[in-house]
A protein has these predicted regions:
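Catalytic alpha/beta active-site cores
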Residues: 2, 82-83, 87-410, 416-425, ...
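N-terminal-proximal low-complexity accessory segments that begin disordered
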Residues: 2-75, 79-92
Length: 434
């Protein structure tokens, strides 16, 4: 194990300290000495509280184990069992009803209902794939899955199967008819899409013209109004992008020149430091934090071989269109990223507290997640690069395996202290309770 060095009153793994001092702190307005002093004070304030909570967990578990042993030969009476759990304090009285108002919450949390992914943050390639899963080809997803049945004539096979491809196209048109229907006719019979007087002008195979049944479905486009390369539609808060290219592999055989339909998909992603990750030492954990740093800075990239070629992965930029009423229409190119810290149980040898005991790892996770995310918040205000995570100015942390309101209250107090330590506005850190 690497030798540790002393900073104020906590012992710190030197590689971990060097990573923070050299790669993270220079991108913030925090001084090295002050940061480590405040970090040490925070550890020594919250580590003992964390241990007491875990001792209470152990006490409860011991009581529960004893109850099950003593009642192993009897059928479980749920009424008696519930009363027992209430008596020992495992089930606590329900609190009073309350209302809260949370500010600076991104639309992906507040108003958009969309899929959420969970990926191990230690794997940069998986993390990038998930972050970029905000948008995905419907055609690719259908062709490569059993949503389109693989009957004899529709098998995918080694090469392109045009019969299967046509079933994919039919499915796509059906989705358009369901989500963004026309005033008359079907998207299946469209031969051209144009933008005319801030509306979608649609020509059908019989040369009749129609438009969308609801004009609000159309929000933006790219290319010329008479021959757009993309038409951006919106249904229930989620975008549908119809890509038009009459020279494309699919578009050249399509009546309307539609080359693909791209759906807004994973609106949020949990970058996981917990269950899906095997981070057992300082080197592993530094890799996890370094990937989070790359995501928050917009610089994370990875290269890997595929079919004899080198493939690169990096974060997708935001998507820019022409709004129907003029000007730019910008849509997020990436999932809104949450960070799932470890739970209260885990300890880390990267740091020790004033008593020489390993520090609860979730405290380190909380500080490092917020510290790195500060870079994203500062870039949001200053550089306009388009790679911001939270456009509302928040940090989203999922805290797993919490046992009851006392532990939730403890984490809220910890987040308050982290915000104060880092100079963040109160409630910048948003807590996801698991």
């Amino acid at each position: 194990m690497a030798a540790s060095i002393r900073s104020v009153i906590a012992m710190i793994n030197p590689q971990f300290k060097s990573f923070i001092d050299q790669e993270i702190l220079p991108q913030t307005n925090l001084g090295v000495e002050k940061f480590w002093q405040d970090f040490s004070f925070l550890i020594n304030e919250f580590s003992p509280q964390n241990r007491k909570l875990l001792e209470h967990r152990a006490y409860l578990q011991k009581q529960i184990d004893a109850w099950h042993i003593s009642n192993r030969s009897r059928p479980i009476d749920m009424g008696n069992y519930t009363k027992f759990l209430e008596d020992i304090g495992y089930i606590v009285p329900e609190g009073l009803h309350f209302k809260i108002e949370t500010t600076n919450v991104d639309s992906e949390v507040a108003t958009i209902a969309g899929p959420q992914l969970v990926v191990p943050l230690k794997n940069a390639r998986f993390a990038l794939n998930a972050a970029n899963a905000r948008w995905g080809s419907l055609y690719d997803a259908l062709y490569g899955s059993n949503v389109v049945p693989e009957t004899d004539s529709l098998k995918a096979g080694a090469g392109y199967n045009p019969l299967r491809g046509q079933e994919v196209i039919n499915y796509g048109r059906q989705l358009l008819d369901q989500s963004v229907p026309l005033a008359n006719g079907s998207h299946r019979d469209v031969i051209s899409y144009k933008i005319h007087r801030q509306a979608l002008l649609v020509t059908l195979a019989d040369n009749s013209q129609t438009t969308l049944s609801n004009s609000s479905y159309l929000v933006a486009f790219t290319g010329d109004e008479d021959s757009p390369s993309a038409v951006l539609l919106k249904h229930n808060g989620l975008h549908i992008e119809v890509l038009i290219n009459r020279e494309g592999a699919i578009g050249k055989t399509d009546l309307a020149g539609v080359n693909d339909i791209v759906l807004e998909a994973a609106t949020t992603t949990i970058m996981d430091c917990e269950d899906s990750v095997a981070a057992v030492d300082a080197d592993d954990k530094i890799e996890v934090y370094r990937n989070w740093l790359g995501l928050m800075c917009g610089t994370l990239s990875v290269e890997f071989p595929r079919n004899g070629k080198t493939v690169s992965r990096r974060l997708n930029p935001d998507k820019i269109y022409t709004a129907i009423n003029g000007g730019d229409y910008q849509s997020a190119g990436r999932s809104l990223l949450f960070n799932r810290n470890v739970g209260l149980l885990m300890e880390s040898s990267m740091m020790t507290d004033a008593d020489g005991k390993p520090v609860p790892e979730h405290i380190i996770d909380g500080v490092l997640t917020a510290l790195v995310s500060m870079i994203d918040l500062n870039r949001r205000l200053n550089d306009g690069s388009g790679y911001n995570n939270s456009k509302a100015g928040s940090i989203y942390i999922v805290k797993p395996k919490m046992h009851g309101p006392k532990e939730v209250s403890f984490v809220c107090q910890l987040f308050d202290a982290i915000e104060k330590m880092l100079g963040l506005a109160p409630n910048t850190m948003k807590l996801g309770i698991m």
